[in-house]
Design a protein with these regions (language model features):
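Bacterial N-terminal signal peptides that target proteins for export
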Residues: 1-8
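Bacterial N-terminal signal peptides
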Residues: 8-17
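N-terminal leader/targeting segments and the immediate start of mature chains
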Residues: 18-58, 213-225
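Short, solvent-exposed helix-to-loop capping segments enriched in aromatics
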Residues: 36, 114-132
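Short beta-strands and strand-coil junctions in structured, solvent-facing domains, enriched
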Residues: 53-54, 74, 81-84, 94, ...
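Short, surface-exposed coil-to-beta transition loops
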Residues: 60-62, 80-81, 88-89, 162-166, ...
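An acidic-aromatic
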Residues: 64-118, 191
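Gly/Pro-enriched, hydrophobic low-complexity segments
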Residues: 103, 130-217, 221-224
Length: 225
């Protein structure tokens, strides 16, 4: 449990929000999942804000994200990148280039179900289909404010919920594009990503999601397998 919080940190109001009735909530969800059918690849810049109870000021860093359906992603935090979270197929690496270290996380059959559920929270903004999404999350609230849909979610996995009791997804009201994510941890700390300069379906070489550890890198496996 403790080792996953650094992983998420390495990566996850002008007017009063208006709560939507159930019927409108379903309509918004239907439109969101319909928009996902047109998403094959995605790229964006982001500003990440980490709010910790032990610090009086939040920590702010810039980064870049690449995503390819169904589940490949590359998060680069810092300019130049100080941390890279990279998933391709059934394997994910968290890479620390300056330290020449990396951590390997399996997503396939060798990964414990509890860890798989928790690591999958990294992709909450890109759901594959509604059935899988609703199996993973309970929708706590859906509001509209400042031309943005604000969706509050709770993981259904008890293990994931003990780490992160709530996460929020922000979607543009005009095209349901991902505008931001915010992860709330059990200790009250928060990690928010605000996306800008997003590009829908840019041409991406599959190699940007692949990584082979250089000989001078130390690679560890937190799962011990």
């Amino acid at each position: 449990m403790k080792m996953l919080r650094p992983l998420f940190f390495a990566l996850g109001i002008v007017c009063a929000p208006q709560m939507l009735p159930a019927g409108q909530t379903n309509a918004v969800l239907d439109a969101w999942f319909a928009a996902q059918e047109n998403l094959h690849t995605w790229s964006a810049d982001f500003v990440q804000t980490r709010t910790l109870k032990t610090l009086t000021q939040p920590l702010i860093a810039k980064g870049h994200i690449l995503f390819a359906m169904p589940n490949d992603f590359r998060w680069e935090l810092g300019q130049p990148a100080q941390t890279i979270a990279l998933r391709h197929g059934d394997e994910m690496f968290v890479i620390y280039p300056r330290l020449k270290r990396a951590e390997r996380f399996p997503f396939g059959a060798s990964a414990p179900t509890e860890w798989h559920d928790t690591l999958s929270l990294l992709q909450a903004g890109f759901p594959g289909d509604r059935k899988a999404f609703e199996a993973q999350f309970q929708i706590l609230a859906l509001t509209e404010t400042n031309r943005t849909w604000q969706m509050s979610l709770q993981p259904k996995s008890p293990f994931a919920r003990r780490l992160m009791p709530e996460l929020r997804i922000s979607l543009a009201t005009n095209d349901f594009s991902l505008a931001g994510t915010e992860l709330t941890f059990v200790d009250g700390s928060r990690l928010r990503n605000d996306f800008t300069n997003a590009v829908l379906n840019p041409p991406l070489d599959e190699k940007v999601f692949e990584w082979s550890p250089p000989a001078d890198f130390k690679v560890t496996n937190p799962f011990g397998k």
